[in-house]
Curated annotation (Swiss-Prot):
Belongs to the V-ATPase D subunit family. PANTHER family: V-TYPE ATP SYNTHASE SUBUNIT D. It comes from the Bacteria. GO terms for molecular function: ATP binding; proton-transporting ATP synthase activity, rotational mechanism; proton-transporting ATPase activity, rotational mechanism. Produces ATP from ADP in the presence of a proton gradient across the membrane. This is V-type ATP synthase subunit D. Keywords: ATP synthesis, Hydrogen ion transport, Ion transport, Transport. The keyword Disulfide bond does not apply. Signal peptide: none annotated. The keyword Ion transport applies.
Amino acid sequence: MTRLNVKPTRMELNNLKARLKTAVRGHKLLKDKRDELMRRFIESVRENNQLRQKVESALVGHLQDFVMAKALESDLMVEEIFAVPMREVNLHVETENIMSVRVPKMHAHIDNPYGDDEGDVVYSYVASNSQMDETIESMSDLLPDLLRLAEIEKSCQLMADEIEKTRRRVNGLEYATIPDLKETIYYIEMKLEEAERASLVRMMKVK
């Protein structure tokens, strides 16, 4: 604890008591914020882990299927299949406020740039094989999960940063500001009591 460098007057005492009251209230609010952020962070980490396992498992399976399907096609045909984008993805990113942390919310709108009549693929079914078609379709279906995974991971990063900032502020109030204010208030109260006793002694001597 460090006593603040202030004059031991009643005015300073009142000011310090007001500052202490504000600091205590701020400490409670910050602790509540930290605890709620921790709760949200843990929930997001759990969801992230589950979704990441799901996505990674699906990607491994789709990659294996793609390798098998690719073996049935010529390299030129595979290049032609992926030369033209199958779908057009418009990504709109908004933000959501979680305990003063602005986390991303992603919304994807997927269009077939060649019109609904063209279907989901823009290459010839005859030129491809069913395994390739199914693999490409399955990979496309992963897009919402991939976007959600990116959204969660960015949110976790932002919340972790804010939790650390809030933790430092809580500790600063708990272990420095509040103890220093209490120590200074105690010191001023002692000084004022001493002054009152000295004044009383002088008055008694005069009488």
